[in-house]
Amino acid sequence: MSKRIAIYGKGGIGKSTIVSNIAAAYSKDYNVLVIGCDPKADTTRTLIGKRLPTILDIVKKKKNASIEEVLFEGYGNVKCVESGGPEPGVGCAGRGVIVAMGLLDKLGTFSDDIDIIIYDVLGDVVCGGFAVPLREDFADEVYIVTSGEYMALYAANNICRGIKKLKSNLGGIICNCRGIENEVQIVSEFAGKVGSKVIGIIPGSEMVQKSEIDAKTVIEKFGESEQADLYRELAKSIYSNEDFVIPEPMGVDEFDEFFRGFQ
């Protein structure tokens, strides 16, 4: 039975960095599959070393694509897939996820030899497409990546609303720090407000940018660093976590009042 994890968060908050690094950490002991569910299609770049063709692009050219044509192996033999999205201004951004999950299921990608499946999902809006990993029972547990910034937490609160509606299991909040004042306190109190907890704190580091410029994870490029160890600790915390809740999101006014308390 695979451990099936969905990582949600606002666009640009660092989901892909978190996902690729914990996947790299898991690869030492487990068979891992990473599925990028973001129209930017950049989740797996640091695992593969380049951008992958997306499932949407592949099926446009070949409707009956094989598993070998959509699944790629990267660092630590991590299997990687990118769902992709439409051209800007054309169609639903979540459609790529719908098409991808249908094809991957049909091709038998979710086989028993996969130990851990990680979905990297855009979470500014939990619309039909982006809700697929949860709604269609492709994932069992959800983690939200946020910083202590207003819009990141606003998106996190909206994601909690979607998780509650879908009756999914929230495993915790990951604080991907941006260096703002009282950041860890803000995120910790937010987690408590929605009935959850902070499961990991990742400080900002130049190593992240240096690694991403080289299209590598921090685990690969700076494997002996404290930053790499923090990703390994986060991976362990997620793997061993058994504390799940259906979150209770704040109302809009309550959220604004909560945030004003830190000004």
Swiss-Prot record:
Modification comment: The reversible ADP-ribosylation of Arg-95 inactivates the nitrogenase reductase and regulates nitrogenase activity.
Top EC category: oxidoreductase
Disulfide partners: none
PROSITE patterns (alphabetical): NIFH_FRXC_1 (PS00746), NIFH_FRXC_2 (PS00692), NIFH_FRXC_3 (PS51026)
InterPro entries registered for this protein in UniProt: NifH/chlL_CS, NifH/frxC, Nitrogenase_Fe_NifH, P-loop_NTPase
Modification ADP-ribosylarginine occurs at: R95
Cofactors: [4Fe-4S] cluster
Annotated binding of ATP, by residue: G9, K10, G11, G12, I13, G14, K15, S16
One of the GO BP terms on file: nitrogen fixation
Keywords linked to the UniProt accession: 4Fe-4S, ADP-ribosylation, ATP-binding, Iron, Iron-sulfur, Metal-binding, Nitrogen fixation, Nucleotide-binding, Oxidoreductase
One MF term in the entry's GO annotations: ATP binding
Pfam families with a match to the protein in the record: Fer4_NifH
Record PANTHER family: LIGHT-INDEPENDENT PROTOCHLOROPHYLLIDE REDUCTASE IRON-SULFUR ATP-BINDING PROTEIN (PTHR42864:SF2)
Assembly notes: Homodimer.
Function (record text): The key enzymatic reactions in nitrogen fixation are catalyzed by the nitrogenase complex, which has 2 components: the iron protein and the molybdenum-iron protein.
Similarity annotation: Belongs to the NifH/BchL/ChlL family.
Protein name: Nitrogenase iron protein 2
Organism: Methanobacterium ivanovii
Gene: nifH2
